[in-house]
C-alpha cells in the first residue's frame, strides 16, 4: 500500500485532521502527516501560497532545501488563503500534478502563475464528509453554532447561544468524525469556520457564514474562492456589532444546491490521485 505523505498543520482542528482520518477511510489508504519538504500530496486546506517562492530571505533559504529534497508533489482540493502572493510566482517544486483545486479563483491564479491550463474539478475535499459518515444522520438540533477553533471563547458566541433554542455548540477541536456527524445532525448551521460550512454543504444543511470580528487570518479570500466553485458570491453575516442572524434568513439566503454538491462529490472522489 502506498503511503500518502500529506502536508497539513499538526493542530487539533477538524478542517485539518480530515486530511488523515477521512481520507484514510474513504480511499482505503495510509496517510502520514508531513511537511512541504517531504510530502507527496497537498490536499484539503489553503496551502497553495506556500508552494511559491517567498520574497523573505530566510523563507527562501528554507524553500531551497525543500526544492532540493522534494520535486514531485500532487495537488488535490487545495487553494490560496490570500488574494495576492507574498513573493514570486515561481514554484518551489519542479513538478506538480494538479488533480483538483479549491475554486475558480484558485484555478485562474494557478493558470496565470504557471502558464498551464487546469481542466480539473473544483471544490473542497470536505464535501466528501457525508460519504465518510455513510449516510444522512437523523436531525437532533435546530441550529448548530460553529466558531472557528481560534474563536471558541469569543464573547459573541455566548450571545449566539442565548439567541436560539435547541442549539448545538460544535467544537472543531473534538474528534473529527464526531464533529462531522454532529454537523449532519443539525437543521441549520451558522459558522465562522469555512470547514464548518463545507461539512454542512456535504449534508445539504442550509448554512450561513458569520464573522465575529475582522481579525481572522486570510481576510475572507478562501471563502470567496470556495463559493466561486459553485458560481456564487460570498456574503457573510457580520455579528461583530451584536447582530444575530434570524432562522428564516439562514434558510432563505442559502443557495448551494444539493445537486451541485453531489456532482462535486463524485468528481472530487474520482479525481483523487493514485500514487
Feature annotation, model-predicted:
Residues 1-275:
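Active-site anion-handling motifs in enzyme catalytic cores
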